[in-house]
From Swiss-Prot:
The active site is at 1393 (proton acceptor). The gene is qkgA-1. Residues 395-619 form the Roc domain. Belongs to the protein kinase superfamily. TKL Ser/Thr protein kinase family. ROCO subfamily. This is Probable serine/threonine-protein kinase qkgA.
């Protein structure tokens, strides 16, 4: 084994030897074999000038090329004395001759160079002895490129023309008994170095001396070569590798000799060209103060200048190819003038401000991609001040860029007005291309001014006049308009302000995407046609759209009326009056915000400009106190694509992908300046430049957006501190430089080019193509939409990007995408058929008394377009539902009952009967929760749509196909959503009509005979059923029989198996349903508790005794401005129906209703914070009396107040004598499963705690004397709750409503109800039990845990010190079991507030059944797919839950918090107490820098690894609690065993036992 290892090592050593270049040393003399053989057995590598070599020692007869000589002598041979004399004499003579040959060689080289450059050297500055004149450098290779290229590319050996260095090795072995003549031999060595070889270790001295001689020799030759060629880069590399000043002085002397010999012998002029290398050597050796290295082809800043020229006062390095200024330049303390112009520098280090004597810094003609050129243009003093302010953390820079938003309806003149403000003429013929181009920047306008008549020289908004061009009046009066698709961005400047003008497309189809571009810190121009009789309605929409985006602060809105040429003074006066009375209140600015202009004559435009500039200054849109790092960040991002116009993409469909490259190339920043590029004439340099440009071009094309981690790196490179990043991001977002959203789907994305994003969005939803039918896009049609615009390889990425912005949703397993904004406005075609078939008219349902109805209405003062499209996608993710159909403003669904889920499980178990016999119609789909959880919120659950060429009915070779369907169910552990996609059958185009919006007050269209007799669940199959319908009816009938048998086996004798027979022909479609059993009559209680028989005279939907739960959610939009004060102008209507059952029996209804309301509230609070929202509840008594009229609506607060007053009902406003049960109209706020206690059943003892939620008392249940804890909700500032007397704890909830805001009252009660709801569904020994609740005030009666909480235990150091290691592990295990139980719920429970105060200790005996329990579920949520919200207690919270308001997260946040609890149990300390940062700094360090507590050094390695896994920054890396519990149990078992075997008892026990 050892031999094999030695052989492997030898092979490895030989392989490594071959990787290095070799330097040979010739060994001469009688003892050469000893030296050669010994040195071969040792590692002999060395590094010379950043290159590694291996020294190889050769015998003189091996005829290898060598660079050094070793001459050996036998120290115990007297003849060696004479040999030494002869050798020394010969070497001395060769040294003299080689020196002369070296001078001749260098002289000849310089002569060849000088003779070919004599014509150009005359123009170079002369070399003088005056100290005030810097040494001029103009390397000879500039004038003789052919010679230079030859010299640079030739392969020269590492040697010189002169003799090789030599040294002596005298063998004087100690184990040799002969007489030594060492002293005599050495006496004749003279100046030559020698080594005495005594033993085997002497090889080290030989190698050391060999290395030193070779290094010196190579560096000497390379110095000569660098000086001869004028290669400053090589000279700098040599100096930095380690050259003594004596070596440099020697090189300088040799260089001067060559230069002056050349001058006296060959130069005919009076001036002398001195190479840059000689100038640098002179500055180093003579400690010079001036150095000029211009035009020296330097590629990097020579660090030798910084290290060895500390006295420099003036440094000129212009006209080179330097790419970076080193931070170490600040070592040049005496530097006053620094010229770095005409290089390739991209950034300037802030530390340059430490050059306190610097007066002149020239940086012109540099790319400066990562440093604001505007600062450089202000001069050296301002630049240094700018850098110093950033380093010192000062915020004193001015930002004069203002985002100007042009909004309004289509055809009002936004684009024309924008061009007039820019200062350009308007050309009708060019308008189309101008509007379709992705961006018109000022620079492009100026560059084309000579060839385009539509551009004029005026390019700024200022107080000076602007040239206007008259456009024929008829163009405007006749309605000749320019259409902007999506958003176009322009920019125009004045001396005081630079506007970024955003021109929003006015077509309604683009409105849903506008929300991503509206920002708070903007100046809005709301443009409308004064001669439009309905202009108030148009203005009203945009005013509320802007207000909704601005939140609580009022935006700055200028109202600009156009087309005044065709208006009378009376019309203008009336328009102004309407604006003042209705809309001016929504603008922060009240004066001079109403403007009337003419885009034909330019009337009013000049005044509008002045007002915009004035208001920008007055309203502080021009910032004068921002950090300079913001400006650097903007510059860096602009370099990557955030600068508008840098990477424009043509909208012309005819453009090829190559034109995209060309257009991007023309707008990309140049890698070299114009001056420096003129010197790069060599083919290799040009090729390198071309490759760099292509590389940057490819990068610029890709970087339309970057991920957030990349953005954070840019922030770090911009000198932003972690706590400044959010403010900087918001600042640039509000200005429109970038787009970044804190929403769960978009927080990891930073859009660098908003114009590009607008183009991508508009290209998909534009009105100019008709490829998307009924909201469904076939990916095969993308060629017609994106072909020529974007490379086909980018299409999948673009689709994913649009999914993030909720514009499109790619349907899994299909090459199709859903475009919600392009869904039909109203139910039409098959959508209408499904709706009419599944949703029985309310009047008919109520007349037959087989249905119970409840719901609620959300009333909005305004709602932007696109709201319901976003809500729809969230509804699709709610579990336990079966989507029937949907359209733009509505969705119809079934709510799955427990029996449905049981049957689905049985269907899954018997899925073998559904062996595929033919292809299933493509519209059939199913989705389980397990599948949906594999999709992120960015990827909606799988939806399957049928082909647009296939009718929605079953298609077969025969004329009819019979199919059987069952209710959608799920397994016992997962719920399912069956999502019915829209039909893609051939439907004739439709014209939008008035909305068909079902509500409680209107009856639906009477169901046709065919639809009323069809099955409610027709055309759907269960989850996981790969069901296929045979082409013959026989097989289908067998399938029906099998399904019937399954249902009968399930005990559902009263249920129906519906058989749907569908006949597909070109002209007609029929459907029949045949019941298989007789359905008994089931009585249902109405609100008055009267039993009402169910009439079986309605459709087959109602004939079955099987309970059925349905919901219809619709959105009603206002029709006109006159309806703006109507409560139903914007209303979200939710209607839920239960057939053949009651709300009391089917808790699935309440659960769905709670999840639906939570989904709606989350969307509104996250994306529509500026809206006024109220929620009302319709009276079911009114609906039962007359479903055709509007019912009375209860206020939500009234229902809550009634519950708190102990009343189970409220009274109808239309019939005050009729009580209505609250649990029937608002089951979400009633928790009927939870027992209720009264005051006479509870005995209060003392207060034991207090928190933000309320007070906690210890008490007893009077019935069994058991200890309890009572948690009370604080509803007022009264101290009554502190009293132990039961009577004093009662409180009138109305007092709260009278003294506090009603919204706060509702919010607190809902939080209380939420915690009760969560706890009522938990039953685990490691979770504090809920016994019941009390009203007036709201209270929870819970299990009492006697040993207090973990926090106070750790604060008591004596108690904590008494905890044994195995007890600590037991506490960890108990807590892990409790959390694991919560995460195994369906859906999982996210506690969100796990910390030591919420961990209670049941026992401190590790052998007790229970030691620790989890409590306080006030912040808990059921994770449908993720939850969101900003949390406190940052020490315990996961990074994704702190610092960002709308960031989403899953149950993995509790895993992170559990790691902090483990740390607390392990150390007794609060996490992060070891640090002393501020809260915001803590949050940023935790989120961005992965700051974590320090684990004890003696922590068990397995526990340490487990904790680090649990607090991983990436939630996906955090382990499951199954794994966590297993690991903790193993650690505890090992600890117990170790403790047992280490016990004194075992140690003293006889070893034989």
């Amino acid at each position: 084994m050892d031999l094999e290892q030695d052989e492997w090592m030898s092979q490895r050593q030989r392989q490594q030897q071959m990787e290095f270049s070799r330097i040979g040393i010739e060994v001469i003399g009688s003892k050469k074999d000893l030296i050669v053989n010994s040195m071969k057995n040792h590692e002999t590598t060395l590094t010379i000038i950043n290159e590694t070599y291996r020294i190889v020692y050769y015998d003189q007869y091996e005829s290898k090329f060598t660079s050094c000589n070793i001459i050996t002598f036998d120290g115990k041979d007297k003849r060696s004395i004479k040999k030494m004399k002869r050798v020394v004499q010969k070497l001395s003579n060769e040294s003299t001759n080689s020196s002369h040959q070296f001078d001749l060689h260098s002289h000849a080289l310089l002569q060849s160079s000088s003779s070919s450059s004599s014509s150009s050297t005359s123009s170079s500055p002369s070399l003088t002895s005056s100290p005030s004149s810097p040494i001029s450098t103009s390397p000879p290779y500039h004038s003789s490129p052919q010679l230079l290229e030859h010299l640079l590319h030739q392969q020269q050996p590492i040697t010189s023309v002169g003799s090789k260095p030599s040294f002596f090795v005298i063998i004087n072995l100690y184990n040799d008994d002969r007489q030594s003549y060492m002293s005599e031999i050495v006496s004749f060595a003279g100046s030559f170095q020698f080594i005495e070889w005594r033993n085997d270790e002497s090889w080290k001295e030989v190698f050391k001396l060999s290395s030193n001689l070779l290094t010196y020799h190579v560096k000497k030759n390379e110095l000569a070569r660098a000086c001869t060629l004028g290669d400053i880069n090589l000279l700098d590399e040599i100096i930095l590798s380690g050259c003594s000043k004596s070596q440099l002085k020697e090189a300088q002397g040799a260089g001067y000799t060559i230069v002056f010999n050349s001058y006296t012998s060959y130069s005919s002029g009076s001036s002398l060209v001195v190479s840059g290398t000689m100038a640098l050597l002179c500055a180093i050796v003579e400690n010079g103060t001036f150095l000029l290295l211009s035009k020296s082809n330097i590629t990097r800043f020579p660090m030798s200048i910084i290290n060895m020229c500390s006295q420099l006062v003036e440094l000129d390095m212009s006209n080179n190819r330097i790419t970076e200024i080193p931070i170490e330049i600040t070592e040049l303390k005496f530097l006053k003038n620094l010229n770095l112009s005409d290089n390739l520098i991209n950034d300037i280090p802030l530390e340059i401000c430490n050059l306190t004597l610097l007066k002149v810094l020239l940086l012109n003609e540099n790319p400066l991609n990562n440093f604001p050129s505007s600062i450089v243009e202000l001069g050296t003093k301002k630049l240094l001040s700018f850098c110093r302010n950033i380093l010192e953390g000062k915020s004193c820079e001015t930002w004069n860029k203002v985002k100007l938003m042009f909004v309004g309806e289509e055809g009002v003149g936004k684009t024309r007005l924008c061009k007039l403000l820019i200062g350009s003429k308007y050309n009708k013929k060019k308008s189309s291309s101008s509007s379709s181009s992705s961006l018109s920047s000022l620079s492009s306008a100026l560059s084309s001014s000579s060839s385009s008549s539509s551009i004029i020289n005026s390019n700024s908004i200022s107080n000076s006049n602007i040239n206007m061009v008259n456009i024929k009046n008829e163009n405007q009066v006749t309605g000749d308009t320019v259409s902007t698709e999506g958003v176009n961005i322009h920019d125009f400047k004045s001396k005081k302000v630079e506007f970024y003008a955003w021109d929003f497309g006015g077509q309604q189809i683009f409105y849903p995407t506008h929300q991503f571009f509206l920002t708070t810190q903007s100046l809005y121009l709301l443009i409308f046609r004064v001669n439009d009789s309905n202009f108030a309605e148009r203005v009203n929409y945009w005013v509320h759209q802007i207000k909704a985006k601005s939140g609580i602060s009022l935006p700055i809105i200028f109202f600009v009326g156009t087309h005044i040429d065709s208006c009378t003074p009376e019309q203008l006066s009336m328009a102004e009056s309407i604006l003042k009375s209705n809309f001016i209140k929504y603008s922060r600015v009240k004066q001079n915000v109403i403007n009337f202009v003419s885009c034909v004559t330019g009337k009013g435009v000049k005044e509008l400009k002045k007002r915009l500039i004035h208001e920008s200054e007055k309203s502080r849109l021009i910032k004068k106190d921002i950090p300079g790092s913001y400006i650097i960040l903007e510059q860096r991002l602009s370099n990557r694509g955030a600068n508008q116009g840098r990477m424009s993409i043509s909208n012309s469909a005819s453009n090829s992908s190559s034109s995209l490259l060309n257009s991007s190339s023309s707008s990309s920043p140049s890698l070299t300046s114009k001056k420096s590029s003129s010197h790069l004439k060599h083919s290799q340099q040009q090729q390198q430049q071309h490759q760099q440009q292509q590389q940057q071009l490819q990068q610029s094309i890709k970087e339309k957006y970057i991920d957030y981690d990349d953005y954070l790196n840019e922030c770090k490179l911009s000198y932003l501190k972690p706590h400044e990043i959010k403010d900087a991001t918001d600042f640039l977002h509000n200005l429109g430089i970038i787009l970044h959203f804190d929403s769960p789907k978009l927080n990891n994305l930073v859009v660098l080019d908003p114009q590009w994003l607008a183009d991508v969005m508009s290209s998909l939803i534009t009105f100019s193509h008709s490829w998307i039918k009924l909201g469904i896009l076939n990916h095969s049609d993308l060629q017609s939409i994106w072909g020529g615009r974007y490379k086909q390889t980018l299409w999948p990425s673009l689709l994913k990007l649009l999914e993030k912005f909720e514009v499109s949703y790619q349907l899994p397993n299909l090459s199709k995408s859903l475009i919600p904004s392009l869904l039909p406005d109203d139910p039409i075609g098959e959508i209408l058929e499904i709706k009419d078939r599944e949703w029985v008219p309310l009047k008919l349902a109520m007349e037959n008394n087989y249905v119970q109805v409840f719901g609620c209405d959300y009333h909005f003062s305004f709602m932007p377009l696109g709201f319901f499209a976003r809500l729809l996608l969230r509804i699709l993710l709610i579990q336990g539902i079966d989507i029937k159909t949907y359209w733009k403003d509505g969705v119809l669904l079934d709510i799955l009952t427990p029996s449905d889920k049981i049957k689905q499980q049985q269907l899954l178990q018997k899925k073998s009967i559904f062996e595929p016999t033919t292809t299933l119609s493509p519209f059939l789909c199913s989705l389980s929760l397990t599948d949906s959880q594999n999709y992120s919120p960015l990827e909606p659950p799988p939806l399957i749509l049928n082909s647009p060429r296939v009718n929605r009915k079953f298609i077969s070779n025969s004329t009819s196909t019979t199919s059987t369907t069952t209710s959608t169910t799920s397994t016992s552990t997962t719920s399912s959503n069956n999502i019915t996609p829209l039909s893609m059958s051939s439907i004739t185009p439709y014209s939008p009509t008035s909305p068909r919006t079902p509500s409680f007050s209107s009856s639906s269209t009477t169901t046709s005979s065919s639809s009323s007799s069809s099955s409610p669940s027709s055309q759907f199959c269960g989850v996981g059923c790969h069901r296929n319908i045979n082409k013959n009816n026989g097989s289908s009938n067998e399938l029906i029989k099998t399904l019937t048998k399954i249902n009968n086996q399930n005990g559902s004798s009263g249920e129906l198996i519906k058989t749907t027979t569908t006949t597909s022909t070109s002209t007609s479609t029929t459907s029949t349903t045949t019941p298989t059993t007789t359905t008994p009559t089931i009585p249902i209680k109405n609100n008055n508790n009267k039993k009402l028989p169910i009439n079986r005279t309605v459709s087959s939907l109602c004939l079955t005794a099987k309970p059925k739960l349905q919901a219809l959610i619709t959105f009603i939009k206002k029709k006109s401005f006159e309806q703006s004060h109507d409560n139903d102008s914007y209303k979200l209507n939710i209607q839920v129906r239960t057939y053949n059952t009651t709300i009391d029996k089917e808790h699935s209804v309440s659960l769905f209703f709670q999840q639906l309301l939570f989904t709606i509230d989350t969307l509104i609070s996250g994306s529509y914070q500026g809206l006024e929202v109220t929620r009302t509840i319709p009276c079911t008594h009114c609906i039962q009396l007359n479903p055709t009229i509007e019912p009375y609506h209860f206020d939500l607060g009234d229902c809550i107040s009634a519950l708190e007053d102990g009343r189970s009902h409220v009274y109808c406003g239309n019939d005050p004598n009729t009580p209505v049960r609250i649990d029937y109209i608002a089951p979400d706020i009633c928790l009927k499963k939870v027992p209720t206690f009264t005051d006479d059943q509870i005995l209060y003892e003392r207060q034991i705690g207090e928190g933000g939620f309320g007070l906690i008392h210890k008490g007893k249940l009077i019935s069994n004397k058991s200890d309890i804890a009572i948690k009370s909700l604080i509803l007022c500032n009264s101290n009554n709750n502190n009293n132990s007397n039961n009577n004093n704890n009662s409180n009138n909830s109305n007092n709260f409503k009278n003294n506090n805001n009603e919204d706060e009252f509702i919010e607190k009660f809902q939080e209380f109800q939420h915690e009760v709801f969560i706890m009522s569904n938990l039953n685990h020994p490691n979770i504090v039990k809920l016994y019941g609740l009390m009203h007036n005030p709201p209270r929870m009666v819970m299990e009492y845990v006697e040993h207090g909480d973990l926090y106070h235990l750790c604060q008591d150091k004596e108690r904590y010190a008494s905890l044994g290691w195995t007890l600590k592990l037991r506490l960890m295990i108990d807590i892990a079991k409790g959390i694991g139980y919560m995460q195994n719920q369906n859906p999982p429970i996210v506690h969100r507030d796990l910390r030591s105060p919420n961990i209670f200790l049941k026992s401190l005996d590790e052998n007790s059944p229970v030691c620790a329990k989890i409590a306080d579920f006030g912040l808990s949520q059921q994770s449908v797919y993720s939850v969101s919200g900003l949390l406190g207690n940052f020490q315990w919270m996961a990074p994704e839950t702190i610092g960002v308001e709308d960031e989403s997260y899953t149950e993995k946040v509790d895993t992170y918090s559990f790691a902090m609890i483990l740390f607390t149990i392990l150390t007794g300390e609060i996490p992060f107490d070891e640090y002393s940062f501020g809260k915001m700094q803590f949050i940023n360090l935790i989120r961005e820098e992965n700051l974590r507590p320090t684990l004890p050094f003696d922590c068990d390695p397995r526990l340490s690894n487990l904790i680090q896994l649990c607090w991983s920054t990436n939630p996906k890396k955090r382990p499951s609690f199954t794994f966590i519990i297993k690991e903790l149990l193993e650690i505890r078992i090992d600890s117990i065993q170790t403790s047992y075997f280490d016990s004194p008892f075992l140690k003293n026990y006889p070893a034989s036992i």
